[in-house]
């Protein structure tokens, strides 16, 4: 029996003001409306349909669109999962799945697609009847293997095609490793290795030794940074080995909900987490989402400090090239000379602060200040911007030190489902930028869902309220490289191995290959370990907070990363091979005396 799908028409997508802002006075859009598509599991009754219409502020469709933008084929949008959750809670049982489309009657489709279409998360159609395809089951992509142990030159091609950003030393290391193992490498192992060993994750430039023609008294840039901490250790409780630093607070307190569901002041010692990080590459490609997910990642860094902490306030900063606000250039400005795939400094300045502030606000944390500055000299400048996301939080003194997990402990993935977004973000942000890899760059930009992060934080807060009885032994946020970086890092830090079953991990995209499931950078996720006997308590909290979680696998005594998906062995690598000591490059810095113009 064919699936029954009904369509309802909702409100306008854009206000008239927003439409002019996006498309100008000569907008190609004649009509723009949200369309709600519902796949029914049985015949919907009249009173149930009226309840649906009231919830969605919708009615029968009144126009015929010639452009419909939907979630990408094979995926379920975050809006859909939230809406279905609401339908379930108010007793609507006939709707199997609900999706929201952007529907237009347009004069010029291409103009609308350029401004309103995200090719990583959306598909587009010319008629409503064609959109029924998104409710059909799609075929999953397969695991791919490459015989680099037989052909050492193959890795050069893969490095370029997959955007791995491996240097010659790393390629030689991989070739030698798989010749020793005498087997092919999987695409998941390649992508995982490239993320874990990217500049973004391993900070190779900061850890390398520099040769300079001016005095430099430290072995590396990291040593220079750390030397400032050594001068005042009295107030620093934790630095450089966790997701954020912890400094001594002066009589701070923490309001929390007790076991009786009443607010109370925590009476123990409370200290302060502090963190800044950058999210440059994504902000340069897509300023709003790049800055939003930059702030989201910094929030997760705070939460995943020690055994759990609570974010309190955030801030952001931007360093960009000259703004060129009008056709009349200022005395210090020349004609723009940036790569085509990067957003303009003007667009970054307008969109990035809104993205960061929006994420903070929707999560429920104030963004309290920020800064921006410009720098450009001849052909050099912040064409690729610096986007700095920072924040402070509160942490109980008893939670500052991470616990000691044991073999057999459950490995939990908490938060939103896996989606094909942000693939290869660690290596993309670490590679040389050209117009040739613009599609790979766009694929590496994450998409934000601050509501899901708030749900995850509510779960962590419940464990935080248990203070010394918090069952979480070790926690990492999921950032660059996704769980393919977070879970191996957790294994390395705990000196244990891990066995993961990818089938267990929540996914909103049924077409994703094992590599994509393992390596995507879907946001708003954490990985942590917890004794198996405490999983029931976690389940109860997650149900109350409506936050998804998966028991992804178990810690093992054998220091090996083993990842399976049905009958596929996706990853099988020893920790020593994955985190091998790869020689760092020697870097050279030369001093230049710049002749600056007077204005």
Predicted regions and their residues:
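Conserved NAD(P)+-binding/catalytic subdomain of aldehyde/semialdehyde dehydrogenases
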Residues: 469
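Catalytic PLP-binding core of fold-type I/II PLP enzymes
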Residues: 490-493
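Short alpha-helical "recognition helix" segments of helix-turn-helix
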Residues: 599
